[in-house]
Amino acid sequence: MKRIEIVAEVAGKVWKIEVQPGVQLAADGTIYILESMKMEIPVVTPLAGKLIELHVAEGDAVLEGDVVAAIAVA
């Protein structure tokens, strides 16, 4: 299995976690919702895979480029 890191594309605050590690996600599946500049931005997986790591919690601040999660793809 190949490990792919998910990075934050914009700075903001984690508003809501949608899934926990161990969950199988489809391509473009939402991992969490980021609040930035009064907008809610879904953070999604680029490919289908299993969420193996989640490095953020609700309320956490993230910066652009932070590694926020990792998925395993076949």
Regions found by a protein language model. Name each.
Residues 1-13, 33-46, 73:
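Short beta-strand-turn/beta-hairpin segments enriched in glycine/proline and small hydrophobics
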Residues 8, 17, 32, 54, ...:
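Preference for bulky hydrophobic residues occupying beta-strand positions
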Residues 10, 20, 47, 57:
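Short, ordered coil/turn segments that flank beta-strands lining enzyme active or ligand-binding pockets
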Residues 16-20, 24, 53-56:
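Short histidine-centered loop motifs in beta-beta connectors
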Residues 22-31, 59-68:
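A structural signal for short beta-strand/turn segments enriched in small hydrophobics and glycine
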Residues 49-61:
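Short, highly charge-biased, low-complexity peptide segments
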Residues 65, 73-74:
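Helix-adjacent hinge/juxtasegments
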